[in-house]
């Protein structure tokens, strides 16, 4: 009887000891806490001063709208108590860093931004081609200092005029080299002049449309400016209604009016076997061969004239 009691006590003690050891091992590590903006400013005064001049800095420091924004530096970088306890240093004890050369993944960096920027133009970010290719917000935007009048665009070099729409062209052109090169062609959209920007046609944060177009189709995108081409027309030109890109290269061309080919070659790319009426050998007449089709067919985008079937009026 006595042996049974002793055995039971020993078993209970061992079970209690095992539970204590397991509990100690299972105990999660102490989480970092928020140190406060003044603690950050004690070491990073220059950075805080630059940040305070940005749109985001003015909100966080002077007019925070919620508890997250009140944390200022730690709103994006996370709790800094561990960073302070370890004496600071680049990347030491900081949950999220955004500096160049950091080992932080683009996904982790973007999550800090998406804590606030979830709606509006950022709605489709997670499913966007840029997110899928590991592009980080800081690849296009600068956080800590004001570099552009809008969008906190990343600074490419000291010569780039970052206070007009040309800034977007420079930022996008860092990756989209072919598109940037096309803008140097004789016929081009006025992006390099700063009259329009890439974001007038595309949403770089993602859309449910092809090639991140702001509108549902290429034509709808073009009609946003070229309203006179929208129609509906009594006589419609099918390739035009199908896709403006059938004839035009929107980023730039060495042909007039952004045409992919010279006129009439852009027409004969479809009208291969169409012989011109009134000529004995089709297009071999000196009055028609290699001449501009639009000299006569001037309403090529569509016509509302009762006799405009051939787009001549």
What positions do the PLM features span?
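Bacterial N-terminal signal peptides
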Residues: 7-19
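Short sequence/structural segments immediately N-terminal
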Residues: 17-313
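N-terminal secretory signal peptides that target proteins for export/translocation
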Residues: 1-3
